Every structure is written in C-alpha cells, then in structure tokens.
C-alpha cells in the first residue's frame, strides 16, 4: 500500500509496522488519519516513537478512531481521566497486566476494537518488551477440517478469571463481564476471519465436554502462539503501540522485576464479534 503523509516500515512479514513522519500531539488531518487507519488494518499493530503526549492529547488521538472505552475492573486509572488506564509494574508488584497471551477485555459483550499504549518509563537494563501475534494467520494456517469445526463453535469469555482470580479484585455490582463469542470472528472492516480465543479470558467452548473443550483450546492457544505469526516491540520512552484487538493478540514480558515500567493506555470501543460464513 502506498502512503503519502506517513512513512511505514514493516516489523515482520506477519505483523507490525513502525510509523514515522507524524506528531500525534497535533490534530490529525484527514489524510494522515486515513493512512494511519489503513496501516493498522494492514499490519494489525503499528508503532510510533518520540511522541510527547498529554493525557488529553492521548485521548484525542484515540477518539479519532471511536468512542473511548472504560475498563470494567478497578485497575488504576488517571484521576480525572477515567479513559486512561495506568499500566505499571515495580518492586511491589505481584503480577503484571498482560503477561499471558490475550486480546483486551474479550469478556465484554462488545470488546474494544483497539488499544493505544503510551510508554513513559522503562527498566534501566532493558526488558518489558511486548509480543504481538496475527490471528488471521492463526486461523488461515489451520487445516480445512479444523477451520470448519472452529467456524461452527462459540466460546465463553469470563472476566472473573482475570479480574477476580489473578488480580484478586472484588466484583462490581452485577459481577464481572462474561460473554459468548464465536471462536472464529469476521473482521468488520477487512472481512477476513481471525481466531478469537485467548488464555486470559476464554474459559470453555460451548457444547463440548470439559476435557474436549480444554484439549481443543490448548491446541488453539499453542497454534496461535507460533513464533512465525509474531513480532516483538522493544519499547523506548515516549513510544506508542496501537493494536487491533479484533485480529491480534499480545503478551507483555515481565522480565524486569524489581524495576519499574510505566505506561498509559487508551482503549477504543468496538462492536459485537460475529462470524460470517
């Protein structure tokens, strides 16, 4: 794809691209916005470096892509900026958000379309990289009989497994979000099919006995985590990663304890996952 207002350099053949030639602190013109959107659709995750954003500018960039999402758990948010989630780990941390392969908040009935993570502080000796995986390729490289099987299945995504279990948070009124989604979802923009299960939130496949569900999910997890489907982003201060939750998974490396890593995430609302044959 030819770009006029931005420069795009692919990270790997499978997924990821670094974008340059744009200052995200400034209002985006229509052409720059459209080309950034196109780069995201083409590469599933896009990276920007050397960006200086206030919380308001971070939110303004996110709002160009849609209404902003409020996280369902009681994880830290920036005071007076409920749309900005604090992503932090240090010597006091007993867990780090995102250290399993996942798509963000897939337990919601309408999971986010994308997430925009802005990194401010990093460990002094490196580490804290984020891995991303192409879920189009995860589906497309399954054998045809397995593709057909998965296209007829749905799965339960349960927020209690993460927020109540790993994070130890008390459930909000009405409980943590819990939803049933197709195992293979159709991307609403590209029309391509992506595998849509993840270790964090998916608890079982509907209609299968537990041993069958567990075995199939584990096989799909292992397959979707194939290195050839991945890229790895090495963060620098003031870097941004913007990923498409509808067709990409990610995994945050926690290899820097007890050092500090601090970032801020804005998340864009999405729509209800669907499957089109």
Listing of model-derived features with the role each one plays in the protein:
Residues 2-240, 245-277:
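Non-heme Fe(II) oxygenase catalytic core, chiefly the N-lobe of the double-stranded beta-helix
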């Amino acid at each position: 794809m030819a770009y006029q207002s931005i420069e795009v350099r692919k990270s790997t053949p499978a997924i990821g691209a670094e974008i340059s030639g744009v200052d995200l602190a400034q209002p985006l013109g229509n052409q720059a916005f459209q080309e950034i959107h196109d780069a995201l659709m083409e590469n599933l995750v896009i990276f920007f470096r050397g960006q200086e954003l206030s919380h308001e500018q971070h939110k303004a960039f996110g709002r160009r892509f849609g209404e902003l999402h409020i996280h369902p758990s009681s994880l830290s948010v920036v005071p007076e900026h409920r749309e900005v989630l604090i992503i932090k780990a240090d010597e006091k941390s007993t867990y780090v958000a995102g250290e399993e392969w996942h798509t963000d908040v897939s337990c919601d009935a309408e999971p986010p379309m994308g997430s925009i993570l802005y990194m401010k502080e990093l460990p002094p000796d490196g580490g804290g990289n984020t891995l991303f995986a192409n879920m189009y390729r995860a589906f497309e490289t399954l054998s045809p009989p397995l593709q057909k099987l998965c296209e007829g299945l749905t799965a339960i995504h349960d927020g209690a497994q993460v927020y109540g279990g790993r994070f130890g948070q008390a459930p909000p009124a009405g409980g943590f979000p819990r939803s049933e989604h197709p195992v293979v979802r159709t991307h609403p923009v590209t029309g391509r099919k992506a595998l849509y299960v993840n270790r964090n939130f998916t608890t079982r496949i509907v209609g299968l006995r537990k041993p069958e569900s567990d075995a199939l999910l584990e096989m799909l997890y292992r397959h979707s985590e194939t290195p050839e489907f991945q890229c790895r982003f090495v963060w620098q201060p003031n870097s941004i990663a913007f990923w498409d939750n509808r067709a990409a998974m990610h995994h945050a490396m926690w290899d820097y304890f007890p050092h500090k890593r601090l970032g801020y995430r804005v998340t864009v609302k999405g729509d209800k996952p669907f499957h089109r044959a």
